[in-house]
Amino acid sequence: MSKKTTPSSAPLDNTPYDVTEQVGHLLRKAYQRHTAIFQQQACDPQLTSIQFVTLCALRDHGPSSQAELIKATAVDQATIRGIVERLKARELVQLSPDPGDRRKVIVELTESGAALLDAMIPCARQISELSMGSLNAGERVAILYLLRKMIDSDENAG
């Protein structure tokens, strides 16, 4: 678990608290913007951004348990279960019992899922481009670096 900043250790700041200037609020707005762009630009209008991330994780890591997908996608257990069910209903993934532990289910990309993923890659590149909006090359590198740094500091603290 990461160390929490307590009020006594937080820097004193007497300026009024403006939620619209806080990192969580700004990240949420940026994510909402990205999600809207994804839905408008996706080659498959039925595919959500997190379903796309899940398909990418399966492509990158191969057949995976739901626990492995949770780690690869940063999605909680209840959400990943629903994502997998929706992808299965579209025959983009298939499920099979884990040979090492029959209680576990292994999720695997189907040929249809791999084909959709291949078709989506050019769209995904365009979505990323649009999501970055008017940021110049240096700003794009900086924002990705800073986001990774925020994530890495949280993972290293645990």
Curated annotation (Swiss-Prot):
The entry's keywords: Aromatic hydrocarbons catabolism, DNA-binding, Repressor, Transcription, Transcription regulation
Keyword DNA-binding: yes
Residue ranges annotated for the HTH marR-type domain, each copy included: 20-152
DNA-binding region(s) from the entry: 66-89
Sample GO molecular function, one term: DNA binding
Protein name per Swiss-Prot or TrEMBL: HTH-type transcriptional repressor NicR
Gene3D superfamilies given in the database record: Winged helix-like DNA-binding domain superfamily/Winged helix DNA-binding domain
One GO term (biological process): catabolic process
Gene: nicR
Induction of expression: Expressed both in the presence and in the absence of the 6-hydroxynicotinate (6HNA) inducer.
UniProt note: phenotype after gene disruption: Delayed growth when using nicotinate as sole carbon and energy source, growth is faster in the presence of 6HNA when compared with that of the wild-type strain.
Function in brief: Transcriptional repressor for the nicCDEFTP and nicXR operons, encoding the lower aerobic nicotinate degradation pathway. Acts under non-induced conditions: repression of the nicCDEFTP and nicXR operons becomes alleviated in presence of 6-hydroxynicotinate (6HNA).
Pathway(s) served: Cofactor degradation; nicotinate degradation [regulation]
InterPro entries, alphabetized: HTH_MarR-typ, MarR/SlyA-like, WH-like_DNA-bd_sf, WH_DNA-bd_sf
